[in-house]
From Swiss-Prot:
This is Glycerol-3-phosphate dehydrogenase [NAD(P)+]. One of its GO terms (cellular component) is cytosol. NADPH binds at residues 14-15, 35, 109, 141, 263, 287, 289. Pfam families: NAD_Gly3P_dh_C (PF07479), NAD_Gly3P_dh_N (PF01210). Its EC number is 1.1.1.94. Keywords: Cytoplasm, Lipid biosynthesis, Lipid metabolism, NAD, NADP, Nucleotide-binding, Oxidoreductase, Phospholipid biosynthesis, Phospholipid metabolism. It is found in: Cytoplasm. InterPro entries: 6-PGluconate_DH-like_C_sf (IPR008927), 6PGD_dom2 (IPR013328), G3P_DH_NAD-dep (IPR006168), G3P_DH_NAD-dep_C (IPR006109), G3P_DH_NAD-dep_N (IPR011128), NAD(P)-bd_dom_sf (IPR036291). It comes from Rickettsia felis (strain ATCC VR-1525 / URRWXCal2) (Rickettsia azadi). Catalyzes the reduction of the glycolytic intermediate dihydroxyacetone phosphate (DHAP) to sn-glycerol 3-phosphate (G3P), the key precursor for phospholipid synthesis. PANTHER family: GLYCEROL-3-PHOSPHATE DEHYDROGENASE, GLYCEROL-3-PHOSPHATE DEHYDROGENASE [NAD(+)] 2, CHLOROPLASTIC. Belongs to the NAD-dependent glycerol-3-phosphate dehydrogenase family. The lineage of its organism: Bacteria, Pseudomonadati, Pseudomonadota, Alphaproteobacteria, Rickettsiales.
């Protein structure tokens, strides 16, 4: 079975740490790269990342370092940073020697900024000719770190690379599917947090379970609309496509939209029950990915003259007049 011999994970938050734990299930040479010296020491000595994952134990052979000078030596580098930090992270890693010789698996969800575009398009500028894949799935970080059953989609223009990564990550408890449609997977990952806000608002307004189920069908159509505009293979007129029904799209949507454990659903719910929307938005301090993604996707809707009613409805709630 074709696999990568060594794997680096860049990003020491909950998702990055859980992905490192996942990768270590099938690979004995996995290193988590992060900036926080205290967390690095904790993982090294205690095999926990209490700040992000509580007392969940990480694999004993998982390595950790803050020394970026060696990251260039890893065949596969998983990028798991917030969307706002994507550009700076790639630029930083370039100064430490990563190149087109390394394969990148992008687990970051959202859009690149200034200008608004997909991460795959931004990488054409930041790291030309790089071999790149994208990861998305119905994955809560703590459940992933506990090795509970889960699944994900892996997309790459080079399907052999996607399959190779799948070989590294698949196990009895973690299943994968692969695709060459990198656009649809990125679009779904970027939009799902916006739709989760809508789900939270519907919950607050007591719209009922039927409405929340109908929301999933409707938002799949909007994912397809934007995907098609950006060059994906999903069609807004034909949702009977494999990728839309896989873990990285509908699976991720259901998990995010139906769980109050999702920051975005929780935000939407609290916004929906607030008596003064403007005060709530001004005083809400927690990072909400969907709120940030919404501002960016509106640029794309305007650019391509798209009709996406759910996005527009959320914008009316979230963006102050």
């Amino acid at each position: 079975m074709n696999k990568f011999k060594n794997i680096a994970v860049y990003g020491g938050g909950s998702f990055g740490t859980s992905l490192a734990s996942l990768a270590a299930q099938n690979c004995n040479n996995v290193t988590l790269f992060l900036r926080d010296e205290e967390i690095a020491k904790e993982i090294l000595h205690n095999k926990t990342n209490v700040k992000y994952l509580g007392d969940i134990k990480l694999p004993t052979h998982l390595q950790v370092t803050t020394n970026l000078s060696v990251i260039k030596d890893f065949e596969l580098i998983i990028i798991a940073v917030p969307s706002y930090a994507f550009d700076d992270s790639i630029k930083l890693l370039k100064t430490h020697g990563i190149s087109a010789d390394n394969t990148l698996l992008i687990a970051t969800k959202g859009f690149a900024r200034n200008p608004t575009e997909l991460f795959s398009d931004r990488l054409k500028t930041l790291l030309p000719h790089s071999t790149t894949a994208f990861f998305a799935g119905s994955n809560l970080a703590k459940e992933l770190a506990k090795n509970l059953p889960a699944s994900a989609s892996i997309a790459s223009l080079d399907i052999d690379i996607a399959n190779k990564i799948a070989n590294n990550l698949s196990s009895k408890t973690f299943t994968t599917n692969t695709t060459s449609d990198i656009v649809t997977l990125q679009v779904a990952g970027a939009l799902k947090n916006i739709f989760a806000i809508k789900s939270g608002i519907d919950l607050a307004k007591k719209q009922g379970k039927n409405a929340r189920a109908t929301l999933i069908v409707t938002v799949l159509k909007e994912i397809a609309i934007l995907s098609k505009a950006l060059g994906g293979t999903a069609s807004s007129r034909s949702l009977d496509t494999n990728l839309l029904l896989e873990a990285g799209v509908v699976g991720d949507l259901v998990l995010t939209c139906y769980s109050l454990g999702s920051r975005n659903t929780k935000f939407g719910y609290e916004l929906g029950i607030s008596s003064d929307k403007k005060i709530f938005l001004r005083e809400y301090k927690e990072l909400v990915e969907g709120q940030e993604a919404l501002k960016l996707v509106l640029d794309l809707i305007k650019k391509y003259d798209l009709q996406m009613p759910i996005i527009s409805e959320v914008a009316n709630y979230v963006i102050p007049e």
